[in-house]
Protein backbone atom coordinates (compact mmCIF):
# COMPACT_ATOMS: atom_id res chain seq x y z
CA UNK A 1 0.00 0.00 0.00
CA UNK A 2 2.87 2.34 0.87
CA UNK A 3 4.55 1.71 -2.51
CA UNK A 4 1.25 2.37 -4.30
CA UNK A 5 0.85 5.64 -2.37
CA UNK A 6 4.35 6.70 -3.41
CA UNK A 7 3.53 5.88 -7.04
CA UNK A 8 0.32 7.92 -7.00
CA UNK A 9 2.07 10.84 -5.31
CA UNK A 10 4.91 10.78 -7.83
CA UNK A 11 2.44 10.67 -10.71
CA UNK A 12 0.57 13.63 -9.24
CA UNK A 13 3.73 15.71 -8.85
CA UNK A 14 4.83 14.81 -12.40
CA UNK A 15 1.50 16.02 -13.78
CA UNK A 16 1.61 19.22 -11.73
CA UNK A 17 5.20 19.85 -12.85
CA UNK A 18 4.28 19.35 -16.51
CA UNK A 19 1.32 21.68 -16.17
CA UNK A 20 3.41 24.36 -14.47
CA UNK A 21 6.24 24.17 -17.01
CA UNK A 22 3.91 24.79 -19.93
CA UNK A 23 2.04 27.57 -18.14
CA UNK A 24 5.24 29.34 -17.11
CA UNK A 25 6.56 29.31 -20.67
CA UNK A 26 4.00 32.01 -21.49
CA UNK A 27 4.83 35.34 -19.89
CA UNK A 28 2.25 38.07 -20.44
CA UNK A 29 3.51 41.11 -22.29
CA UNK A 30 3.81 43.97 -19.84
CA UNK A 31 2.79 46.62 -22.30
CA UNK A 32 0.31 45.85 -25.07
CA UNK A 33 -0.97 48.31 -27.60
CA UNK A 34 -4.61 47.55 -28.29
CA UNK A 35 -5.37 47.87 -31.98
CA UNK A 36 -9.09 47.16 -31.99
CA UNK A 37 -10.76 46.31 -35.26
CA UNK A 38 -12.96 49.28 -36.19
CA UNK A 39 -16.59 49.38 -37.16
CA UNK A 40 -17.16 49.96 -40.85
CA UNK A 41 -17.90 53.63 -41.55
CA UNK A 42 -19.16 54.41 -38.04
CA UNK A 43 -17.67 57.27 -36.00
CA UNK A 44 -16.47 56.47 -32.51
CA UNK A 45 -18.70 57.26 -29.55
CA UNK A 46 -17.18 59.79 -27.12
CA UNK A 47 -16.35 58.66 -23.59
CA UNK A 48 -19.39 60.04 -21.81
CA UNK A 49 -22.76 58.46 -21.08
CA UNK A 50 -24.85 60.26 -23.68
CA UNK A 51 -24.06 61.61 -27.11
CA UNK A 52 -26.16 63.35 -29.77
CA UNK A 53 -25.54 62.41 -33.37
CA UNK A 54 -27.31 61.63 -36.65
CA UNK A 55 -28.09 57.94 -37.01
CA UNK A 56 -26.84 56.51 -40.31
CA UNK A 57 -29.78 55.45 -42.46
CA UNK A 58 -32.21 57.84 -40.71
CA UNK A 59 -33.57 61.05 -42.22
CA UNK A 60 -34.22 62.75 -38.91
CA UNK A 61 -31.80 63.65 -36.17
CA UNK A 62 -31.98 61.32 -33.18
CA UNK A 63 -30.44 61.32 -29.72
CA UNK A 64 -28.50 58.21 -28.85
CA UNK A 65 -28.27 57.67 -25.12
CA UNK A 66 -25.32 55.29 -25.00
CA UNK A 67 -24.35 54.45 -21.47
CA UNK A 68 -22.65 51.82 -19.34
CA UNK A 69 -24.72 50.58 -16.42
CA UNK A 70 -23.16 51.04 -13.00
CA UNK A 71 -25.51 48.58 -11.27
CA UNK A 72 -27.38 45.40 -12.14
CA UNK A 73 -29.83 45.80 -15.05
CA UNK A 74 -33.52 46.11 -14.28
CA UNK A 75 -36.51 44.27 -15.79
CA UNK A 76 -36.47 46.45 -18.92
CA UNK A 77 -33.14 44.87 -19.89
CA UNK A 78 -34.60 41.35 -19.98
CA UNK A 79 -37.73 42.59 -21.75
CA UNK A 80 -35.54 44.04 -24.51
CA UNK A 81 -33.42 40.89 -24.71
CA UNK A 82 -36.36 38.49 -24.95
CA UNK A 83 -38.09 40.64 -27.59
CA UNK A 84 -35.11 40.38 -29.94
CA UNK A 85 -34.71 37.70 -32.64
CA UNK A 86 -31.20 37.28 -31.22
CA UNK A 87 -32.49 36.53 -27.72
CA UNK A 88 -30.20 34.17 -25.83
CA UNK A 89 -29.50 33.09 -22.27
CA UNK A 90 -26.22 35.02 -22.37
CA UNK A 91 -28.20 38.27 -22.47
CA UNK A 92 -29.95 37.61 -19.13
CA UNK A 93 -29.46 40.36 -16.56
CA UNK A 94 -28.76 37.70 -13.91
CA UNK A 95 -25.20 37.16 -15.18
CA UNK A 96 -24.24 40.66 -14.02
CA UNK A 97 -24.41 39.47 -10.40
CA UNK A 98 -23.50 35.80 -10.95
CA UNK A 99 -20.15 36.34 -12.70
CA UNK A 100 -19.21 39.38 -10.64
CA UNK A 101 -19.97 37.69 -7.30
CA UNK A 102 -18.51 34.28 -8.15
CA UNK A 103 -15.32 35.40 -9.91
CA UNK A 104 -14.88 39.11 -9.32
CA UNK A 105 -14.88 40.03 -13.02
CA UNK A 106 -15.91 43.60 -13.75
CA UNK A 107 -19.17 43.95 -15.72
CA UNK A 108 -19.52 46.37 -18.63
CA UNK A 109 -23.19 46.44 -19.59
CA UNK A 110 -23.98 48.96 -22.33
CA UNK A 111 -27.34 50.23 -23.61
CA UNK A 112 -28.12 52.39 -26.64
CA UNK A 113 -31.54 54.04 -26.59
CA UNK A 114 -33.12 56.08 -29.44
CA UNK A 115 -35.27 59.11 -28.69
CA UNK A 116 -38.16 57.92 -30.86
CA UNK A 117 -39.32 55.27 -28.41
CA UNK A 118 -37.92 52.43 -30.50
CA UNK A 119 -36.34 49.28 -29.18
CA UNK A 120 -33.04 49.73 -27.33
CA UNK A 121 -29.83 47.81 -27.93
CA UNK A 122 -28.22 45.93 -25.06
CA UNK A 123 -24.66 44.66 -24.92
CA UNK A 124 -23.35 42.79 -21.85
CA UNK A 125 -19.63 42.16 -21.36
CA UNK A 126 -17.04 41.44 -18.68
CA UNK A 127 -13.39 42.40 -18.30
CA UNK A 128 -11.49 39.15 -17.68
CA UNK A 129 -7.82 38.95 -16.71
CA UNK A 130 -6.73 35.84 -18.61
CA UNK A 131 -3.26 35.10 -17.27
CA UNK A 132 -1.02 34.34 -19.06
CA UNK A 133 -2.78 35.48 -22.24
CA UNK A 134 -3.60 39.08 -21.31
CA UNK A 135 -6.84 40.88 -20.49
CA UNK A 136 -9.97 40.55 -22.61
CA UNK A 137 -13.35 42.23 -22.73
CA UNK A 138 -15.76 39.42 -23.55
CA UNK A 139 -19.45 39.25 -24.40
CA UNK A 140 -20.18 36.81 -22.86
CA UNK A 141 -17.62 34.75 -20.89
CA UNK A 142 -18.52 31.09 -20.23
CA UNK A 143 -21.58 31.32 -22.50
CA UNK A 144 -22.38 30.66 -26.16
CA UNK A 145 -23.59 34.13 -27.15
CA UNK A 146 -23.77 37.70 -25.94
CA UNK A 147 -24.46 40.98 -27.61
CA UNK A 148 -25.23 43.34 -29.09
CA UNK A 149 -28.89 42.55 -29.59
CA UNK A 150 -32.11 44.44 -30.27
CA UNK A 151 -32.75 47.79 -31.91
CA UNK A 152 -31.51 48.90 -35.31
CA UNK A 153 -28.13 48.46 -36.93
CA UNK A 154 -27.09 52.09 -36.24
CA UNK A 155 -27.92 51.57 -32.58
CA UNK A 156 -25.97 48.31 -32.47
CA UNK A 157 -23.03 50.08 -34.08
CA UNK A 158 -23.19 52.78 -31.41
CA UNK A 159 -23.17 50.17 -28.64
CA UNK A 160 -20.25 48.39 -30.30
CA UNK A 161 -18.30 51.64 -30.60
CA UNK A 162 -18.79 52.25 -26.88
CA UNK A 163 -17.67 48.76 -25.87
CA UNK A 164 -14.58 49.03 -28.10
CA UNK A 165 -13.79 52.31 -26.37
CA UNK A 166 -14.21 50.69 -22.94
CA UNK A 167 -11.81 47.91 -23.93
CA UNK A 168 -9.20 50.33 -25.26
CA UNK A 169 -9.43 52.62 -22.23
CA UNK A 170 -8.68 49.71 -19.90
CA UNK A 171 -5.73 48.36 -21.87
CA UNK A 172 -7.45 45.16 -22.93
CA UNK A 173 -5.28 42.98 -25.15
CA UNK A 174 -8.32 41.46 -26.80
CA UNK A 175 -12.06 41.78 -27.28
CA UNK A 176 -14.37 38.82 -27.86
CA UNK A 177 -17.92 39.16 -29.18
CA UNK A 178 -20.08 36.04 -29.46
CA UNK A 179 -23.20 36.61 -31.51
CA UNK A 180 -26.15 34.93 -33.18
CA UNK A 181 -25.90 37.15 -36.26
CA UNK A 182 -23.04 38.90 -38.12
CA UNK A 183 -21.73 42.24 -36.89
CA UNK A 184 -20.62 45.35 -38.76
CA UNK A 185 -16.95 44.73 -37.99
CA UNK A 186 -13.93 44.78 -40.28
CA UNK A 187 -12.81 41.35 -39.07
CA UNK A 188 -14.21 37.96 -40.07
CA UNK A 189 -15.87 35.84 -37.39
CA UNK A 190 -14.98 32.29 -36.45
CA UNK A 191 -17.69 29.95 -37.70
CA UNK A 192 -16.45 26.81 -35.95
CA UNK A 193 -19.26 26.65 -33.39
CA UNK A 194 -23.00 26.17 -33.67
CA UNK A 195 -25.70 25.98 -31.04
CA UNK A 196 -28.30 23.26 -31.45
CA UNK A 197 -32.00 24.08 -31.14
CA UNK A 198 -35.07 21.86 -31.11
CA UNK A 199 -38.67 23.05 -31.31
CA UNK A 200 -40.90 21.34 -28.76
CA UNK A 201 -44.45 20.03 -29.21
CA UNK A 202 -47.11 20.81 -26.65
CA UNK A 203 -47.04 17.41 -24.94
CA UNK A 204 -44.38 14.76 -24.12
CA UNK A 205 -46.22 11.97 -25.95
CA UNK A 206 -45.89 13.83 -29.23
CA UNK A 207 -42.20 14.41 -28.55
CA UNK A 208 -41.69 10.71 -27.81
CA UNK A 209 -43.26 9.72 -31.12
CA UNK A 210 -41.00 12.17 -32.96
CA UNK A 211 -37.82 10.61 -31.56
CA UNK A 212 -35.82 8.09 -33.53
CA UNK A 213 -36.26 4.43 -32.54
CA UNK A 214 -32.61 4.21 -31.47
CA UNK A 215 -33.04 7.14 -29.08
CA UNK A 216 -36.16 5.63 -27.52
CA UNK A 217 -34.39 2.29 -27.08
CA UNK A 218 -31.47 3.96 -25.30
CA UNK A 219 -33.87 5.73 -22.93
CA UNK A 220 -35.53 2.38 -22.15
CA UNK A 221 -32.09 0.80 -21.67
CA UNK A 222 -31.26 3.38 -19.00
CA UNK A 223 -34.50 2.57 -17.19
CA UNK A 224 -33.82 -1.18 -17.37
CA UNK A 225 -30.28 -0.57 -16.06
CA UNK A 226 -31.66 0.96 -12.88
CA UNK A 227 -31.05 4.62 -13.76
CA UNK A 228 -33.42 7.07 -12.09
CA UNK A 229 -33.70 10.84 -12.49
CA UNK A 230 -34.45 13.55 -9.92
CA UNK A 231 -34.99 17.27 -10.47
CA UNK A 232 -34.25 19.88 -7.82
CA UNK A 233 -32.25 23.05 -7.22
CA UNK A 234 -29.68 23.92 -4.57
CA UNK A 235 -30.49 20.67 -2.76
CA UNK A 236 -28.87 18.73 -5.62
CA UNK A 237 -25.90 21.02 -6.25
CA UNK A 238 -23.38 18.89 -4.31
CA UNK A 239 -24.25 15.77 -6.29
CA UNK A 240 -24.11 17.63 -9.59
CA UNK A 241 -20.73 19.14 -8.77
CA UNK A 242 -19.28 15.79 -7.72
CA UNK A 243 -20.02 14.35 -11.18
CA UNK A 244 -19.16 17.56 -13.03
CA UNK A 245 -15.71 17.85 -11.42
CA UNK A 246 -14.76 14.28 -12.36
CA UNK A 247 -15.95 14.68 -15.94
CA UNK A 248 -14.13 17.99 -16.42
CA UNK A 249 -10.90 16.39 -15.18
CA UNK A 250 -11.40 13.50 -17.61
CA UNK A 251 -11.90 16.01 -20.44
CA UNK A 252 -8.74 17.88 -19.45
CA UNK A 253 -10.58 21.09 -18.56
CA UNK A 254 -10.39 23.11 -15.31
CA UNK A 255 -13.69 23.01 -13.46
CA UNK A 256 -15.90 25.96 -12.56
CA UNK A 257 -16.17 26.72 -8.86
CA UNK A 258 -19.13 25.36 -6.95
CA UNK A 259 -19.78 28.96 -5.89
CA UNK A 260 -20.36 29.85 -9.55
CA UNK A 261 -23.22 27.36 -9.75
CA UNK A 262 -24.52 28.35 -6.33
CA UNK A 263 -24.71 31.97 -7.44
CA UNK A 264 -26.41 30.84 -10.66
CA UNK A 265 -29.12 28.83 -8.90
CA UNK A 266 -29.69 31.54 -6.31
CA UNK A 267 -29.91 34.41 -8.82
CA UNK A 268 -32.02 32.70 -11.48
CA UNK A 269 -34.28 31.22 -8.81
CA UNK A 270 -37.22 29.13 -9.94
CA UNK A 271 -36.28 29.19 -13.65
CA UNK A 272 -33.06 27.24 -12.97
CA UNK A 273 -32.91 23.59 -11.95
CA UNK A 274 -30.50 20.72 -11.39
CA UNK A 275 -31.25 17.31 -12.91
CA UNK A 276 -29.44 14.28 -11.45
CA UNK A 277 -29.23 10.76 -12.90
CA UNK A 278 -28.56 8.04 -10.33
CA UNK A 279 -27.56 4.39 -10.47
CA UNK A 280 -29.03 3.17 -7.24
CA UNK A 281 -28.19 5.91 -4.74
CA UNK A 282 -25.03 7.12 -6.50
CA UNK A 283 -25.13 10.15 -8.83
CA UNK A 284 -23.73 9.24 -12.25
CA UNK A 285 -24.91 12.24 -14.29
CA UNK A 286 -26.12 15.80 -13.88
CA UNK A 287 -27.08 18.91 -15.79
CA UNK A 288 -28.09 22.52 -15.23
CA UNK A 289 -31.27 23.70 -17.01
CA UNK A 290 -32.29 27.37 -17.24
CA UNK A 291 -35.39 28.87 -18.83
CA UNK A 292 -35.05 32.29 -20.44
CA UNK A 293 -37.81 33.70 -22.59
CA UNK A 294 -39.45 30.84 -24.47
CA UNK A 295 -36.36 28.62 -24.47
CA UNK A 296 -34.96 26.09 -22.01
CA UNK A 297 -31.16 25.91 -22.08
CA UNK A 298 -28.72 23.26 -20.88
CA UNK A 299 -25.36 25.07 -20.63
CA UNK A 300 -23.65 22.39 -18.48
CA UNK A 301 -24.08 18.62 -18.40
CA UNK A 302 -21.86 15.71 -17.40
CA UNK A 303 -21.93 11.97 -16.85
CA UNK A 304 -19.37 9.58 -15.41
CA UNK A 305 -17.63 7.65 -18.17
CA UNK A 306 -17.65 4.49 -16.08
CA UNK A 307 -21.47 4.40 -16.33
CA UNK A 308 -21.97 5.54 -19.93
CA UNK A 309 -22.91 2.00 -21.02
CA UNK A 310 -26.11 2.39 -18.97
CA UNK A 311 -27.08 5.52 -20.99
CA UNK A 312 -27.78 7.80 -18.00
CA UNK A 313 -27.40 10.88 -20.23
CA UNK A 314 -30.27 9.67 -22.43
CA UNK A 315 -32.75 9.35 -19.58
CA UNK A 316 -31.50 12.59 -18.03
CA UNK A 317 -32.06 14.58 -21.23
CA UNK A 318 -35.38 12.88 -21.92
CA UNK A 319 -36.68 13.87 -18.50
CA UNK A 320 -35.49 17.45 -19.04
CA UNK A 321 -37.16 17.62 -22.46
CA UNK A 322 -40.33 16.02 -21.11
CA UNK A 323 -40.60 18.60 -18.34
CA UNK A 324 -40.01 21.40 -20.83
CA UNK A 325 -43.02 20.19 -22.84
CA UNK A 326 -45.17 20.05 -19.71
CA UNK A 327 -44.08 23.59 -18.81
CA UNK A 328 -45.15 24.92 -22.21
CA UNK A 329 -41.61 25.76 -23.36
CA UNK A 330 -41.40 26.51 -27.10
CA UNK A 331 -37.85 25.33 -27.81
CA UNK A 332 -34.86 23.60 -26.27
CA UNK A 333 -31.25 24.79 -26.63
CA UNK A 334 -28.72 21.95 -26.22
CA UNK A 335 -25.77 24.35 -26.22
CA UNK A 336 -22.79 24.80 -28.50
CA UNK A 337 -20.78 22.16 -30.33
CA UNK A 338 -18.30 21.88 -33.17
CA UNK A 339 -19.93 20.46 -36.29
CA UNK A 340 -19.23 16.74 -36.67
CA UNK A 341 -18.03 16.29 -33.07
CA UNK A 342 -19.35 13.63 -30.72
CA UNK A 343 -21.43 16.14 -28.78
CA UNK A 344 -22.83 17.49 -32.04
CA UNK A 345 -23.99 14.00 -33.06
CA UNK A 346 -25.48 13.43 -29.60
CA UNK A 347 -27.59 16.57 -29.89
CA UNK A 348 -28.73 16.08 -33.47
CA UNK A 349 -30.10 12.62 -32.63
CA UNK A 350 -32.75 14.41 -30.54
CA UNK A 351 -33.90 16.31 -33.62
CA UNK A 352 -31.90 19.48 -32.89
CA UNK A 353 -30.76 21.65 -35.79
CA UNK A 354 -27.75 23.94 -36.12
CA UNK A 355 -27.85 27.67 -35.52
CA UNK A 356 -24.65 29.40 -36.54
CA UNK A 357 -22.61 31.22 -33.90
CA UNK A 358 -20.49 34.20 -34.99
CA UNK A 359 -17.51 34.58 -32.68
CA UNK A 360 -15.38 37.67 -33.26
CA UNK A 361 -11.92 38.13 -31.77
CA UNK A 362 -9.89 41.31 -32.18
CA UNK A 363 -6.45 41.79 -30.63
CA UNK A 364 -3.25 43.76 -30.97
CA UNK A 365 -1.16 40.92 -32.39
CA UNK A 366 0.41 41.57 -35.78
CA UNK A 367 -0.27 37.92 -36.61
CA UNK A 368 -3.51 36.94 -34.89
CA UNK A 369 -3.73 33.59 -36.71
CA UNK A 370 -0.31 32.57 -35.41
CA UNK A 371 -1.20 33.83 -31.94
CA UNK A 372 -4.39 31.74 -31.91
CA UNK A 373 -2.46 28.70 -33.13
CA UNK A 374 0.10 29.10 -30.33
CA UNK A 375 -2.72 29.59 -27.81
CA UNK A 376 -4.48 26.43 -29.04
CA UNK A 377 -1.29 24.34 -28.86
CA UNK A 378 -0.66 25.54 -25.33
CA UNK A 379 -4.14 24.62 -24.17
CA UNK A 380 -3.82 21.18 -25.80
CA UNK A 381 -0.62 20.45 -23.85
CA UNK A 382 -2.11 21.79 -20.62
CA UNK A 383 -5.21 19.66 -21.16
CA UNK A 384 -3.13 16.50 -21.46
CA UNK A 385 -1.35 17.25 -18.18
CA UNK A 386 -4.63 18.15 -16.47
CA UNK A 387 -6.15 14.72 -17.19
CA UNK A 388 -3.39 13.10 -15.12
CA UNK A 389 -4.17 15.05 -11.96
CA UNK A 390 -6.28 13.61 -9.12
CA UNK A 391 -9.77 15.06 -8.87
CA UNK A 392 -9.11 16.56 -5.43
CA UNK A 393 -6.27 18.59 -6.98
CA UNK A 394 -8.35 19.77 -9.95
CA UNK A 395 -11.19 20.76 -7.64
CA UNK A 396 -8.77 22.77 -5.50
CA UNK A 397 -6.94 24.69 -8.23
CA UNK A 398 -9.31 24.37 -11.20
CA UNK A 399 -11.66 27.27 -10.37
CA UNK A 400 -8.73 29.71 -10.10
CA UNK A 401 -7.75 28.81 -13.66
CA UNK A 402 -11.26 28.36 -15.04
CA UNK A 403 -12.40 31.85 -14.17
CA UNK A 404 -9.68 33.22 -16.47
CA UNK A 405 -10.73 31.07 -19.44
CA UNK A 406 -13.63 32.77 -21.19
CA UNK A 407 -14.91 29.79 -23.19
Where are these regions (language model features)?
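Acyl-donor-binding surface of acyltransferase catalytic domains
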Residues: 2, 6-12, 16-55, 139, ...
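Short loop/turn motifs at secondary-structure junctions
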Residues: 106, 171-173, 328
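Conserved acyl-donor/pantetheine-binding loop and adjacent beta-alpha core of acyl/acetyltransferases
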Residues: 127-145
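Aromatic (often tryptophan-rich) hydrophobic motifs at membrane interfaces
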Residues: 109-114, 132, 143, 154-166, ...
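Active-site/acyl-donor-binding loops of N-acyltransferases
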Residues: 16-19, 26, 34-61, 109, ...
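Short catalytic-loop micro-motif centered on adjacent basic/acidic residues
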Residues: 176, 231, 331-335
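A conserved beta-strand-loop-helix scaffold within acyl/acetyltransferase catalytic domains
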Residues: 64-117, 125-133, 179-192, 198-309
